[in-house]
Amino acid sequence: GKPSRPRPAPIQPRPPHPRL
């Protein structure tokens, strides 16, 4: 069988950065 490699964590959408 294929060696199970750890899958990368899903990219979480970041909240919009407030412009100051």
Swiss-Prot record:
Primary residence: secreted
Subcellular compartments: Secreted
Going by the UniProt record, its keywords in alphabetical order are:
Antibiotic, Antimicrobial, Immunity, Innate immunity, Secreted
Q: Name one GO biological process term.
A: defense response to Gram-negative bacterium
Induction profile: By bacterial infection.
- Mind naming one GO cellular-component term on file for this protein? extracellular space
Q: Region (Disordered) spans which residues? A: 1-20
Domain of life assignment: Eukaryota
* Residue ranges that the Swiss-Prot or TrEMBL entry lists as coiled coil: none
- What does it do? Antimicrobial peptide active against many Gram-negative enterobacterial and plant-associated bacterial species. Not active against other bacterial species like H.pylori, P.mirabilis, B.pertussis or N.gonorrhoeae.
What family is this protein classified in? Belongs to the apidaecin family.
**Protein name, entry field:** Apidaecin 3+
What is the protein's species of origin?
Answer: Pimpla disparis
